[in-house]
Regions:
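Hydrophobic anchor at the start of a short beta-strand
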Residues: 27, 64, 113
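Short, flexible active-site-adjacent loop segments at beta-strand->alpha-helix junctions, enriched
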Residues: 33, 47-48, 55, 60, ...
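Short gly/ser/thr-rich secondary-structure transition/capping motifs
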Residues: 22-30, 94, 154-155
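Catalytic core of membrane glycerolipid acyltransferases/transacylases, capturing the structured
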Residues: 9, 14-15, 22-23, 35-94, ...
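Short amphipathic alpha-helical segments and helix-helix/interface helices
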Residues: 17, 79, 134-138
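A short beta-turn/loop motif at secondary-structure boundaries
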Residues: 33-36, 164
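Generic structural signal for residues in well-ordered beta-strands
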Residues: 27-29, 87, 145, 171
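Non-catalytic C-terminal accessory region of glycerolipid acyltransferases
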Residues: 2-5, 98-218
Length: 218
């Protein structure tokens, strides 16, 4: 991967973030070779903390775009900061056609898009169900779909906490999901649901592998 096409401010933040992540969180990345170095890629990640986009951005060397709930885009200086981080707003609770259209555009332009298939942060770390919009986007674009599991961010910055604390954080990238069977199927809610199930199964497998490694290191 290369950083030639990164926005200057975004590139600078990544340069700053990486050593800080390693120092403060004992940051480790596994399976980064599973992320294609070019072309549109959907990174499907469990959502545990507001730190998640930061640790993903610090582990890849490409421009990373991601959705963030629309309520975060105020006041204006927060909005400008989020936009500088390649974030774009999405309304939760109902299908947001504008956000979906933007996501498809980003992928068709050959970019890396971070998606939280569950739609919101987990309260207790358990994995939930993928939103149908995830399957729709994956079905409509000829892009790689990579499951990702992040571990430790919930301990570092749990939901409801105002403060960040030191914790071991790891990111595990799985192999791209074989999408051929789904993309050859008709566009339907059933197909989108099956894609979502495959995505969450991929994340669950990575979570299980991580838990086994943690038990083995004790």
């Amino acid at each position: 991967m290369n950083s030639r096409n990164m926005k200057p401010f975004y590139h600078l933040l990544c340069i700053i973030a990486r050593p800080l992540l390693k120092a403060f969180f004992k940051f480790q990345v596994f399976g980064i070779e599973n992320v294609p170095s070019a072309g549109g890629v959907m990174l499907m990640i469990n959502h545990a903390s507001y730190l998640d986009p930061i640790v993903i951005g610090g582990s890849v060397n490409r421009n990373l775009y991601y959705m963030a709930k629309s309520t975060l885009f105020s006041p204006w200086f927060i909005k400008r900061f989020l936009i500088s981080l390649n974030a774009f707003p999405v309304r939760l609770g109902s299908p947001d056609r504008g956000a979906i259209k933007r996501a498809i555009q980003i992928l068709n332009e050959g970019n890396l898009l971070l998606i939280f298939p569950e739609g919101t942060r987990s309260i207790d770390g358990t994995l939930g169900k993928a939103q149908d919009g995830v399957g729709f986007i994956a079905h409509r674009t000829n892009t790689a779909v990579v499951p990702v599991f992040v571990d430790g961010t919930r301990a570092a910055w749990p939901r409801g906490s105002k403060f960040i604390k030191s914790a071991k954080v790891t990111v595990s990238y799985g192999k791209p999901i074989d999408m051929s069977i789904y993309r050859s199927s008709e566009a339907s809610r059933e197909t989108y649901s099956k894609i979502g199930e495959a995505v969450m199964a991929g994340i669950a497998d990575l979570k299980h592998e991580r838990e086994l490694l943690k038990k083995g290191s004790r």
